[in-house]
Swiss-Prot record:
Site residues (Transition state stabilizer), renumbered to this chain: 35, 252
Originating species: Salinispora tropica (strain ATCC BAA-916 / DSM 44818 / JCM 13857 / NBRC 105044 / CNB-440)
Enzyme Commission number(s) of this protein: 2.7.2.8
Gene this chain is encoded by: argB
Name recorded for this polypeptide: Acetylglutamate kinase
Pathway named in the protein's UniProt entry: Amino-acid biosynthesis; L-arginine biosynthesis; N(2)-acetyl-L-ornithine from L-glutamate: step 2/4
Length: 295
């Protein structure tokens, strides 16, 4: 390779860094909550790249907090153990036996692996769950099938949050990695929806952004029409769109809506199948995915 080619490549890298400068200045010291899931969690290379992105945010002066689910991994483990599992109203029926597996997979497998990948770059990540330090108190969630209530067991929503454990970690320069298991008022553990938990945490932390990783490029106003991708939408506009959305996008967009209506300045849905999608959203002028604003 010629010296000229080397210089051109170096200049291109420098231009990319300079493009990020205003965003580095804008978000320095800000908390960003990232909901980690989908293919970004399933693909080994994307897992490593996501971990590196979180470390980059930390070195860039931001305060990332990761909230993860683990539905596919839970299903694999249940099958391996020969435990029957079913879904009602789009939610996994969580018996006490299933709850034991949920806790084992989220805390002992998914969370631990992500902590390890982040800490390959330095001693930054600390794993915790909604059970630690009274972080979350859950309330049992009601599901409906054909308009009728059904019992789905130990599945919960966030009733309240005590963020002191997370803020202490952030003040110490750590990257909290949160597994979505939390007790109710009676101490019974519940499996929380990770999108809902991420939104609740973003509100409680007064985060600058909520970023939700998905397996699609963003919100489509008229799925599967690929030309209907929405780059920006207000809370009121999103509320009108929700009833018509594809079922898999509803909890993610509801989380974004809840976050911005709860005081988070912006929430984003980005394609986790694209390497470094979180960085593309935060540090480029074009942004990435769909942004939800208060309006």
């Amino acid at each position: 390779m010629s010296v000229t080619a080397d210089l051109t490549g170096a200049q291109a890298k420098a231009a990319t860094l300079i493009e990020a400068l205003p965003w580095l200045a804008r978000f320095a010291g800000s908390c960003v909550v990232v909901k980690y899931g989908g293919n970004a969690m399933a693909d080994p290379e994307l897992r490593r790249e996501f971990a590196a992105d979180m470390v980059f945010l930390r070195y860039a002066g931001l305060k990332p907090v990761v909230v993860h689910g683990g539905g596919p991994q839970i299903s694999v483990m249940l099958d391996r153990l020969g435990i029957d599992s079913e879904f009602r109203g789009g939610l996994r029926v969580t018996t006490p036996e299933v709850m034991d597996v949920v806790r084992m997979v989220l805390l002992g497998q998914v969370g631990r692996e992500l902590v390890g990948l982040i800490n390959a770059h330095g001693p930054f990540a600390m794993g915790l769950s909604g059970e630690d330090g009274g972080l979350f108190t859950a309330v049992r969630r009601q599901a409906y099938v054909d308009g009728q209530p059904v019992d789905i067991g130990q599945v919960g929503d966030v009733e309240s949050a005590d963020i002191s454990a997370v803020t202490h970690l952030l003040e110490a320069g750590r990257i909290p990695v949160l597994s979505t298991v939390a007790p109710d008022a009676d101490g019974v553990p519940h499996n929380l929806n990770a999108d809902t938990a991420a939104a609740a945490l973003a509100i409680a932390l007064r985060a600058r952004k909520l970023v939700v990783l998905t397996d699609v490029p963003g919100l489509y106003a008229n799925w599967p029409d690929r030309s209907s991708l929405v780059s920006e939408v207000t809370a009121d506009e999103l509320a009108k769109l929700l009833p018509s959305l594809e079922s898999g996008m509803v909890p993610k967009m509801e989380a974004c809506l809840r976050a911005v209506r709860g005081g988070v300045p912006a929430a984003h849905v980005v394609d986790g199948r694209v390497a470094h999608s979180v960085l593309l959203e935060i540090f480029t002028s074009e942004g990435f995915g769909t942004m939800v604003t208060p309006g």
